[in-house]
Design a protein with these regions (language model features):
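Extracytoplasmic/periplasmic substrate-binding proteins
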Residues: 72, 91-198
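Short catalytic/ligand-binding loop motif for oxyanion handling, primarily in non-cytosolic enzymes
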Residues: 15-16, 67-71, 136-140, 207-208
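Mature extracytoplasmic/periplasmic domains
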Residues: 174-175, 179-236
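Charged, glycine/proline-rich intrinsically disordered loops and linkers
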Residues: 28-34, 144-158, 226-236
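Helix-loop-helix "hinge/cap" segment bordering the ligand-binding cleft or interdomain interface
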Residues: 2-66, 78-111, 185-191
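Short aromatic-enriched loop/helix-cap "lid" or pocket-rim segments at secondary-structure transitions
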Residues: 67-76, 141-142, 222-224
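Secretory-pathway/luminal and periplasmic proteins that interact with or process carbohydrate-rich
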Residues: 53-58, 129, 205-209
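Short, solvent-exposed loop/turn and secondary-structure capping segments
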Residues: 8, 28, 72-73, 140-141, ...
Length: 236
């Protein structure tokens, strides 16, 4: 009906996070620009999957790793009146998943299960993972460590495969996730809630600091451009 129901501080562009060491063995390079040239469409991606398999690696961990990349590129909604419509791009994902499973290009895991997490760690032999920006610091980093932070490990090169990941765009643009802030209906703190929501999602300085503090990607273009053009970086 045109009324705003929530707001968010995040932008959640998708990317492909790959193991530098594996890319170098399979493709002869770990440079993000060069790796992207090998993965810039699905035909090329599938070719690299075959190359990775020949070297003893899986291209993806599980059945649903690539799902969002396909599902974010459909042409129409799932439901039309009382009819459920399966977009051709979804069927491309089904076909690819069957091929990868039959040929051993994936490890038959599912998102968030223990095998999927282990495949991102020191013993993993998976070329890469489709992730959004939040997934790098909130999930992939922790899974990469040999000794978890909770057990005294440090987030630093030398602990597991910390530092062995790089990212590129992958075969198709997509997004994954986004956390939204909503006010409770009937609240008696309207002014305070409005101020909190506006500050967290509209204040350039605050949004820039969120990224600097947590590595979360915020939806303020100017703030993100300033960080991109600075010397800010992550050892991970």
């Amino acid at each position: 009906d045109g009324s705003q129901r929530g707001t968010t501080w995040q932008a959640t562009p998708g990317l492909f996070a790959y193991r530098r060491s594996i890319a170098k063995e399979v493709l002869g390079t770990d440079d993000p620009t060069e790796v992207q040239s090998h993965l810039s469409d699905w035909d090329k991606f599938n070719e690299v999957a075959a190359q990775a398999s020949a070297k003893g690696y899986k291209m993806l961990s599980g059945f649903d790793d690539a799902y969002r990349t396909f599902s974010n590129n459909v042409d129409a909604p799932w439901v039309d009146g009382t009819t459920v419509k399966v977009d051709p791009n979804i069927m491309k994902w089904v076909d690819q998943t069957k091929e990868y499973t039959d040929k051993g290009y994936n490890n038959k895991s599912s998102l968030w299960d223990s095998q999927w997490a282990a495949d991102q760690g020191p013993s993993g032999k998976v070329f890469g993972f489709f992730y959004s920006t939040w997934g790098i610091n909130f999930t992939l980093l922790g899974n990469s460590l040999e000794t978890p932070v909770a057990e005294g490990g440090k987030e630093e090169v030398g602990n597991g495969i910390y530092g062995d990941y790089a990212v590129c765009e992958g075969p198709q643009p997509y997004y994954w996730g986004g956390t939204w802030i909503c006010a409770a209906a009937g609240t008696d703190n309207t002014d305070i809630i409005r101020d909190v929501m506006q500050k967290l999602t509209c204040d350039e300085a605050i949004m820039k600091q969120i990224t600097l503090d947590t590595q979360d990607y915020t939806n303020n273009e100017k703030a993100m451009e300033e960080i991109a053009n600075s010397d800010y970086a992550s050892d991970f």
